Amino acid sequence: MTEGKRLQQMELPQMKSIWIDEDQEMEKLYGFQVRQRFMNGPSTDSDEDADEDLGIVLVDSKKLALPNKNNIKLPPLPNYMTINPNINSNHKSLTNKKKNFLGMFKKKDLLSRRHGSAKTAKQSSISTPFDFHHISHANGKREDNPLESHEEKHDVESLVKFTSLAPQPRPDSNVSSKYSNVVMNDSSRIVSSSTIATTMDSHHDGNETNNTPNGNKQLDSPTDLEMTLEDLRNYTFPSVLGDSVSEKTNPSSPSVSSFSGKFKPRELSALHTPELGNCFNVDQSLNSPGNRISVDDVLKFYYQCSETSTPRNT
């Protein structure tokens, strides 16, 4: 038997591994008898020994290909966090950060529920930056929150009274900002009825003179600026009708003379040239409406001069 097995091994081709897909190739290599043994499987122990001697391993067979023929029981896989302590610490830190970030938005809601709607608490959201207040110019009344505390009302009233009863030469730039900060809704929206850009100085006067050498502004005396109703009634406006109209008025009243002295007419030198004055024979010493030269007279004079002054032919 042993000699026959050896002869059979010698007849088989010597190769390390081969894949056989078709029956014809198997018949060519191993012959019909070997094919019968592959398909039917071993029947006796001697045949199994023969297969082992040949070194043939069937892929779909029930025989175990490993040398040990017992299943090895492996322990369960450990948790990946216990293997590396750094992974465990990083995971805990990430979870804590996430909880703290989400808890930041829940604490404000819990506080507002405990203390009720009377306590004004800022409700932050993800879309608004930190400590952000929106200034609204739409309305100065608190329409969103009708229930406001008595202390805030008292502060606003005292602030308005102070600004109205005690004016300063220059407006306080912080008054509007203080007022807007006091009037605030629960939705962190500042309702402002006035801003710094819209404030005006009520004490500004256009009759202010330039700065003196000492650096102080010198205003006109109150007597020069005061004007009574009698002065307005007795004041005669200038006209171009002639001296007859001016003689009809009553120049003897001291109030008229004092009031009219403030409004001096322009000098005649500013209205015409000396040539124009000689043409019309105007006496500059007289200061009456009849001596005044109108714009039409000036234009007419220059128009006549341009017509008469023609170039001479030599």
UniProtKB/Swiss-Prot annotation:
Transmembrane segments: none annotated. GO terms for cellular component: cell cortex; cellular bud neck; cellular bud tip; cytoplasm; cytoskeleton; incipient cellular bud site; mating projection tip; nucleus. It is found in: Bud neck; Bud tip; Cytoplasm, Cell cortex; Cytoplasm, Cytoskeleton. Residues 140-156 have a biased composition (Basic and acidic residues). Residues 208-221 have a biased composition (Polar residues). InterPro entries: CRIB_dom. One of its GO terms (molecular function) is small GTPase binding. Residues 126-139 form the CRIB domain. Keywords: Cell shape, Cytoplasm, Cytoskeleton. The keyword Isomerase does not apply. Required for cell size and shape control, bud site selection, bud emergence, actin cytoskeletal organization, mitotic spindle orientation/positioning, and mating projection formation in response to mating pheromone. Belongs to the BORG/CEP family. This is GTPase-interacting component 1. It comes from Saccharomyces cerevisiae (strain ATCC 204508 / S288c) (Baker's yeast).
